[in-house]
Structure formats: C-alpha cells, structure tokens
Amino acid sequence: MRHWLAGLMLLIAPSAFAQQAVPNIAFDSVPNPLKLPPNMYFGEVSGVSVNSKGHVFALSRGNTSGPAYAAAATQLLEFDAKGAFVREIGKNLYAWSFGHTVKIDPQDNIWVTDKGSDMVIKFDPEGRVVMVFGRKQEASDEDTAPLKHPKPPLPAEDGRFRQVTDVAWDKAGNTFISDGYINSRVAKVDKDGNWLKSWGDRGKEPGQFNTPHSIATDANGNVYVADRGNHRIQVFDGDGKFLRQFTIDIPVPPGAKPAIGKIPDEAMMAGGTFFPGSPWSLCITPPPNQVLYSSDAWPGRIYKLSLDGKVLGILGQSGKQLKQFGWIHAMACPSENVLYVAELLNWRVQKLLLKP
C-alpha cells in the first residue's frame, strides 16, 4: 500500500506543483487614464495600442450617429502620454462599421480592422488614409446585402476579408492579418500592400482555426495566433509553417463570477469562446526579453506566458471595479510591467501597472 501511494503521488505531483507554481501578479490600475472631452463617451472599447511617443489609441464603438451594428458606430481616438485627449481620427470614414482592433506599427502608422465592413485601413501618423485592404459590402452587390454574409460562407478569396480581426508585422514590414470569424485563416501582405499568401481554414487540426481573434509577432518573426474557438494559441514561422501550439490550463478559482450572464456550462464552453484560458487577445512585449500576455472572458483573467507557452503568472478577475475586467478584447504591452486593456462590457481602457 505504501508503494502504491508513493506511485500515486508521483503521478499527481507534477500537475499539482505546476498549478501551485503559477503566482498571482500584484498590480494597480491607474484611475481615469484616458480623459475624454465633455460630452464624449466611450462605447464598447474593442482596441487599444500605443505608439513610440507613448500616445494611446483607443477604438470605441461609441458613435451614436448610427445603429449599434452599422455605419458610423466606430470611433478612433488618440490620447497623449499623460492621457489627455488629442483628436478623433477618421471621422465619418467610409469603412467604419464595427471596429475590431487598432494597432500601431514600428513606423507609428495606425492600422484598424473593421469586422463589420470586412476592411483593414492603414493611416499614416498624421491620420491620413494611405492604404486600404478588402472591400465593404454594398446593397448593390450581387447575392449579398450590407452587414450580412451568406451561409454556407463563400470560398475565401485573395484580398477579400470576412469579419477580419487583427494585424501584426515582422521586421521586413510584412503584415499578417487574422481573418477572422468566417475565413478562418491568416493572410500575409508585403510592405507595399501586395498579397503574398494565406494559410489555414476552419477546423481543429494544427494550422486550422476556429475564429483567429488576435495576432502578434515576436522579434524572430514568428506569428502567434489566438485561435479562440479552439481555445489555444498557435505559433507559425513567417511563411506559415506550423511550429507549436499551447493552451492555458489554470483552474477557475472557487467563487468566480462571470462578467455578464450565468456561469458558462459545458455546452457553452464547448464552443471555445468561454472556455477558461481561451485567448481573446494577445500582445508581446518589446525585446530583448519578450513575454506574451493573453486574456480570456471566463473567468476574466490576464495570463503572462513565456513564448514557449509556460504560464508565468495571472492577474485579475471579472467585474466592474478597477482591477476587474469585463471581456478584455484587446491589450497593448509597451513594456513587461505596463499593460493597457480594452474592455467591451465596461466601456473603458484600464492602464495596469504590474508589480511582479
């Protein structure tokens, strides 16, 4: 019996010790980090990014001149390094429909993905449109209608997106686009906007996706994809060769409450979106010592990981107070211990100062 118990302990100990070894990271949330002008309000904040000057860009679905899921809901807002409002970029832009993410490239160009219009827009640092990808559907288009997609979906096409989600870059200036809710693939275009290739389709195998929802690159040009519906992160080289995948498997703490609705049951979690640890957003810190941050909707945490997928720490929980989260949709990590998080349900951006 004694030997049997010893063997049992050897089997369960690594898992138990691994769970105990994941620390909770202490952190603060800066009150009111982004200061809007009077009579301007955030709606759902779906994107956040930071440029080389420390200016913060927030993508909000707060424009009330149109329906919640139609033209003009998107607003792209810029704040200086102290959080003071600078300007709105792209007001009344043709592509605006249902903004998904905003990202700043190494040259401080501003990129926005719009899920509703199926478009990616590149602005220069002054806020002028310099490149567009995809095409917005119009009422005159054959076999389709505005803001709708046929079922079953049409075959994926080069240069056309269907509910596109995010962008990232490598050192050569190539852009990687996660596309998205329908096409379930990653696209690659060069610095001049020429379509190079795409990889992936809908499925569960390595190299397949179920809602590639966020994308990031490391200093070596590897591409990290938040495969949200399959509750995993997949890693590829810059040509789309599958390298590895990993999942975040940290138990939900007792007493955890969802940000909205009931606690997800097995059927709800089976869809992937609300599976604990399922990645909604990714960001990778600058070199030389890069780490990966990922967020989930349930139980509403942020995870700090090494680039090979080891969970180094966790922080936060669902809720409405500072240091709590309501569906983090995007993150920016200008340094290892400073995070900006964009929340859908709480209509805000939080600035987090980590104290590991």
Regions found by a protein language model. Name each.
Residues 1-6:
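Bacterial N-terminal signal peptides that target proteins for export
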Residues 13-14:
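N-terminal signal peptide c-region/cleavage motif recognized by signal peptidases
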Residues 19-356:
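Eukaryotic scaffold repeat domains enriched in small/polar residues
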